[in-house]
Amino acid sequence: MSKIAIIIPAMNEERSIAKVIDGLRAHFDFPIIVVDDASTDDTRQIAEKRGAIVLPHILNLGAWRATQTGLRYAINKGFDSVITCDADGQHPAQAVESLLGQANDSDALVIGSCLARGSTGRHIAWRVFKRLSGLNVSDLTSGLRLYRRPAMAVLASRQATMFEYQDVGVLLMLQKLNMSCSEVSVNMQERKDGISRIFHSWGAVISYLLYTGILSISRLGPFKAEEYHQKLISGANSE
């Protein structure tokens, strides 16, 4: 039987993290790994009281590197798959159930997509990034994802640490390595507490658009997928 863990990167989510953990525990027996990205509130303490495995960052490293911390922990503990979801309550247990119920066992990555969310501007940006990058993914920024062991090994590597977000760069890397990806439709909820790490200010939005645009145009540059894949797997196994 496949060993699955849930990874939740979190920063200053004390208002929502208890409800998120309780909701998941009511539906699943999977270990819940909360990576506390140097929160200044009680996120860590609340997650610990709710029985989650808490991996604390001393410094704020961002949501993607927090996710990497969870991936490395899961690999070291022998998990075959992980589900990543947000700490703000956007991904209810029902969405995780939909993701698991519709996931294809042969895919290295399964994305829980919700095209109903997001503003018109965000949808326009998605279409532009899809065109520039060549990615055939509808919901580029969804944090609700199922990663199988091959994708986990690649994305836990030092080479993948260059990314700032769990979207275009991650998808491009897996695509370059010929890893299969699929999407399933899920229902998500609106964020009720906290602030978005990307959309909390115009400066952050512009920085994200520039960063993602450059990644999309570059497509991570030319390299031999199989050779790079073996290098990443070897590096991940040695860490």
Where are these regions (language model features)?
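Membrane-proximal helix-turn-helix segments that form the acceptor-binding/catalytic region
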Residues: V128
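Glycine/proline-rich active-site loop of Rossmann-fold NAD(P)-dependent oxidoreductases
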Residues: D193
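Activation loop
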Residues: I124-A125, G143
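C-terminal, flexible cofactor-proximal segment of oxidoreductases
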Residues: H200-W202
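Structured catalytic core of nucleotide-sugar glycosyltransferases
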Residues: M1-H123, R131, Y147-S157, Y165-M188, ...
